[in-house]
C-alpha cells in the first residue's frame, strides 16, 4: 500500500470528524488525558507541521487555536511535499528523539491520526468507523512494540483488555489504552 495514499485516507477521515466539531465542543475533555478537543486538534495539526518541517530539515513550530481548515491545509501541503522524489527516504528526528526516515514518520503519523480521529469523534459524540485497511496496517506495523515504547515515555495509556473476538479496530484501540 502506498504510504502517501494511506496518509491521505487517514487525514481525510480526520478532516470529516473535525469539520463536525461545534465551537462549543472545543473545551470538552477527550480520551487523551489532560487534552481538550482544541488541544487534540492542535496536536493533530501539529503532526502535519512536523512532517513539513522534517522534510525541510527544520524543527516544527508549536501551534494553538487551529481548526479543521488548518489541519486540512497542512495535510494537503504535507502530502504534496511527500511526493517529491526521495522524500520518504530522507532521515529526520522523531518526536521521541531518535532518527528515522520520513517514510517511518509518515507511518507513525498515520497511526497517530487514526487513533486521534477516534478520540475526537468520541469526545464530540460522533460515530466514526475507522478505515479497516488503515487499522490493519497499524496493527501489523506497530503492535505490540510501539504502544510499549509509548507507555515508557508516558504518551500511551495502559493496555485496555478487549474480548478475544474483538474487531481489529477495538484491538488496536485497546492496545493504545482506549476504552471502547
Where are these regions (language model features)?
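Structured surface interface patches that mediate subunit assembly and partner/cofactor docking
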Residues: 1-13, 20-33, 46-67, 73-180
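Extended, alpha-helix-rich binding/interface surfaces that flank or overlap catalytic cores
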Residues: 40
Amino acid at each position: 500500500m502506498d504510504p502517501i495514499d494511506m496518509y491521505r485516507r487517514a487525514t481525510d477521515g480526520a478532516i470529516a470528524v473535525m469539520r463536525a466539531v461545534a465551537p462549543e465542543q472545543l473545551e470538552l475533555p477527550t480520551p487523551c488525558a489532560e487534552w481538550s478537543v482544541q488541544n487534540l486538534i492542535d496536536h493533530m495539526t501539529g503532526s502535519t507541521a512536523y512532517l513539513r518541517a522534517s522534510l525541510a530539515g527544520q524543527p516544527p513550530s508549536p501551534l494553538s487555536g487551529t481548526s479543521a481548515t488548518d489541519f486540512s491545509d497542512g495535510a494537503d501541503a504535507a502530502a504534496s511535499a511527500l511526493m517529491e522524489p526521495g522524500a520518504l527516504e530522507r532521515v529526520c528526528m522523531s518526536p521521541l528523539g531518535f532518527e528515522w526516515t520520513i517514510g517511518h514518520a509518515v507511518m507513525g503519523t498515520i497511526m497517530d491520526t487514526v487513533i486521534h480521529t477516534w478520540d475526537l469523534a468520541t469526545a464530540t459524540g460522533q460515530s466514526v468507523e475507522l478505515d479497516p485497511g488503515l487499522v490493519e496496517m497499524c496493527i501489523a506495523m506497530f503492535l505490540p512494540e510501539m504502544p510499549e515504547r509509548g507507555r515508557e515515555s508516558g504518551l500511551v495509556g495502559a493496555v485496555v483488555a478487549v474480548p478475544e473476538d474483538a474487531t481489529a479496530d477495538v484491538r488496536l484501540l485497546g492496545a493504545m489504552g482506549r476504552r471502547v
